[in-house]
Amino acid sequence: MPSQSNNVITSSTASSSMSSSSNSSDASSTSSSNTNNAHSSNNQFVSGQLNLVGNTHTKINDNYEIISKIGEGISGSVFKAIKKGTEEMVALKNFKGWTEGDRASKEECSLLQQLRHIPYITPVIDIYTNFETSEYIIVFPYFEHDLSGLLSEHRLSIPQVKCYFKQLLEGINEIHNAGVMHRDIKAANLLVNNKGSLFIGDLGTATSYTKRSVFSSKVVTLWYRAPELLLGSTQYGPEIDMWSIGCVLIELVTSRNFLPGSSEQQQLEAICKLCGTPTDEIWPNVSQLQNFNQISHLPVYPSRLRTVFKNFSNDFIELLEGLLTLNPKKRLTAEQALQSPFFTNHPLPFKPENMPGYQPIHVLEAVQKRVQQQQELEQQKKQEEQKKQQEEQKKLEDQKKQEEQKKQEDLLKRQRLLKRQQELKKQQDEQRQQELIKKQQEQEQLRLKVEHEKQRQEQERLRLIQQEQERLKRQQQEHEQRLQREQQQQLNQLQQQKESPLNNSYGKINLKRSLDLVNDIRNYCTSETESEYESDEEDFYTEEEVEDYSSDEEDDYYNAQSNKSLYTPIKAMIQQHNNNQQHQQQYPYSQQQQEPISSNPFLQPPKKQRTASTGFNNNNGNNNNNNNLSTPLTIH
């Protein structure tokens, strides 16, 4: 552009073609998609001067001072400028080139002229043209905001929403009544000022739907594109603008777009999940559309508009359902939408003059601000990620440290447990050893006790043996003493016998015969039976005496024969005894009393004691019981 400083055009062309039309909104609507180009064009444009000559045959730089770039579109860029002398803020839209094939630019200029009577279309202040390069600049009034930039910074109340939305419906209704489809309704193409007025800009894709019936389906920004366009329909009408207006209504109340698809496939899926899946029942012949196979695999979703917007009024939901109807033939028109109770029920819409003012911001500025905010957010996110990574690294280190510490603790615990087990095992071993020692000691004590008991028993046995030996010894001694006494007595008796008269009478009778005589006397005195005598005789004599008796019996016989005059039978002795008793009775004092028979040692009883008969006494017939012979005779 700086090289075109001397080119001029006729003023009639500018005044007749752009007297009441505006296209600054068109540039601002597409600026968000070409931000980098906007920055480069801005630097190039601002660095030079506007050399184009306007209808006054003056240079544009003589009338306007460029301040900043506020938008970028398909056909050109939009700049914020000040009119010199009046300090009036204006918007300059630069069309890069106009060739015979550039139908969009020609149609936009034609539509601006056709729709200049509509108050909701941005008016044209002036136009500057360069015929050699087909470049021209249109001067529009400056609007403080576009709706996208405004919603990015502020949340609107329901009365504000109703005010802006009613103006939008009124403006689009007049455009449709003029037989024109806008085909790019979106928040960035809606311009508002601080007086509360809304204007529709960017007619670059607008076209008349009365002159032809087949159109391109690749129109309207993706987030605001109607489902029939996404399904590939090429026969459509102004109802596509009503779908876009429904999306703008959601954006007005939520300050964000509810259908942000990144591709046509994702956009169709988002529409189906929110508004329901299109079928032939609710939309006849929809399955015949070119791109229907993109949603044929989807389940039949019901509409979720009432669920998602359940916190809003019923009239708002009904209006939204009418605008976002899948079947385009049943979709509300702008005129029908203006009859909605949404605008007559409380809260009522604000009047434009009562709308609050805001700090100026446009979509490019909003985009730049969003980019800056996004960069800040990315930087912040990056810092947070770094911080998070550091925290995670620290956490991992702490976790690793804790794991190592836990391992150390587990190791120490295992060591303590092992040590404890060893100590316990040692204690158990010691306890078992002690028990074993104790058991051995008990066994030893028991053994010692048994041995002691055995020793005691042995000692007792020895003591008893000793006692028995002593007893036997005493008995032996007593026996010997008794034998000695007996021998002494026998000696004494023998001595007495030698001295006794009986011995003189029978001196030649041996001891055996004396014993026989004594036994006969004893048996006679005790009146014992023959059997008793025989038993006593057997008990009385020992074996040696029996042998002596048998050996001496023959000698006695011969001795008795030889000494027959000296042998006196027992009966003779008894007779003599009786005679003596009778003699004593007859002559008691004739002679001195003789000694009793018991004084004779040969008349003593044998070792086995016998009781003397009561009929025999030695007291010369005295019957006194005290003088009876009751003491047994003992032979020593």
Swiss-Prot record:
Biased composition (Low complexity): 486-499, 579-594, 617-628
InterPro entries: CDK, Kinase-like_dom_sf, Prot_kinase_dom, Protein_kinase_ATP_BS, Ser/Thr_kinase_AS
Biased composition (Basic and acidic residues): 473-485
Matching SMART domains: S_TKc
SUPFAM superfamilies named in the record: Protein kinase-like (PK-like)
Catalytic activity: L-seryl-[protein] + ATP = O-phospho-L-seryl-[protein] + ADP + H(+); L-threonyl-[protein] + ATP = O-phospho-L-threonyl-[protein] + ADP + H(+)
Gene Ontology MF terms in the entry: ATP binding; cyclin binding; cyclin-dependent protein serine/threonine kinase activity; protein serine kinase activity; protein serine/threonine kinase activity; RNA polymerase II CTD heptapeptide repeat kinase activity
UniProt-listed Enzyme Commission number(s): 2.7.11.22
Class of this enzyme: transferase
GO BP terms in the entry: positive regulation of transcription elongation by RNA polymerase II
Amino-acid positions noted as binding ATP in the UniProt annotation, renumbered to this chain: 70-78, 93
Bias-annotated ranges (Acidic residues): 529-555
Active site per the UniProt annotation: 184 (proton acceptor)
Sequence ranges assigned to domain Protein kinase in this UniProt record: 64-343
Domain of life per record: Eukaryota
Alphabetical UniProt keywords: ATP-binding, Kinase, Nucleotide-binding, Serine/threonine-protein kinase, Transferase
Residue segments, region Disordered: 1-41, 378-408, 473-506, 527-555, 579-636
GO cellular component: cyclin/CDK positive transcription elongation factor complex; nucleus
Similarity remark: Belongs to the protein kinase superfamily. CMGC Ser/Thr protein kinase family. CDC2/CDKX subfamily.
Name of this chain's protein: Probable cyclin-dependent serine/threonine-protein kinase DDB_G0278487
Organism: Dictyostelium discoideum
